[in-house]
A protein has these predicted regions:
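Residues lining hydrophobic/aromatic ligand-binding pockets adjacent to catalytic sites
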Residues: 1-234
Length: 234
């Protein structure tokens, strides 16, 4: 059984979804520290002028360093109306926009105060749209261990997994002999974001999964699987 861990994200790009497709169990790492540089609260779409970020405004006490689970959405800003207006304007001509539109609008407009709640709804939509069968567990339900290797061992044991999908560069941060002694193997994902049809000329990589879904529809699931390769990292 393969374990993966990743912070929850707001309609993440295909490369991030590849980890969900490759793992048997995914830990939604809500206890990780929030970073504005990550895709936790934002996603990139394609407009007539190129890439545009849609960001969910957040508030939290004592950050930077605040856990994702402790952040709330700032409803003093009309972000939901803006996100939906921008999506509808730029994708209404896409072949499958209206196939997903109702569900996506409901997620965006139905957001409560909790950022994690919004991300959980977005994650459920992503997994359902791609027919992913990985079991998702919140990190809040697992042992809290500060040290990286110890946390991985505790999570692998709790989830019944014997392999772990590493992030790029993560192997150098882990105690590899300790993992080997515990019978935990390491894998890595090789994902190639092959060009697919988009609104406009050329191809922009790294956009939200919404871009892939609106343009390719149910074929997005096959696209993702066809471009994933899992190789041993140990």
């Amino acid at each position: 059984m393969i374990l993966a861990a990743a912070p929850p994200a707001y309609f993440p790009p295909p490369a991030a979804c590849a980890k969900l497709a490759a793992a048997d169990v995914v830990v939604s790492a809500e206890s990780f520290r929030f970073s504005r540089k990550e895709g936790t609260h934002r996603t990139a779409i394609r407009t007539m002028t190129g890439r545009r970020w849609l960001s969910v405004p957040v508030v939290g006490s004592g950050w930077p360093g605040t856990r994702i689970s402790d952040l709330a959405i700032d409803f003093n800003q009309p972000w939901a109306d803006e996100h939906w207006r921008v999506l509808e304007y730029n994708y209404h001509n896409a072949a499958y926009f209206y196939y997903y539109a109702e569900a996506v609008e409901r997620i965006i407009r139905g957001a409560g105060q909790s950022l994690v709640g919004l991300l959980a709804d977005a994650g459920q939509f992503v997994r359902g749209s791609l027919a992913l069968r990985a079991r998702v567990i919140s990190s809040s339900l697992l042992p809290e261990v500060a040290e990286r290797t110890g946390r991985l061992l505790a999570w692998a044991e709790a989830c019944g997994c014997d392999r772990y999908l590493i992030h790029p560069g993560e192997a150098g941060l882990l105690d590899l002999p300790r993992l080997e002694a515990a019978g935990i193997g390491l894998d890595r994902i090789e994902f190639t974001e092959a060009p697919y049809h988009q609104q406009g000329p050329g191809f922009l990589p790294g956009l939200s999964l919404l871009d892939l879904l609106f343009n390719e529809g149910p074929a997005a699931a096959g696209y993702l699987q066809a471009n994933i390769r899992i190789v041993p990292a140990d």
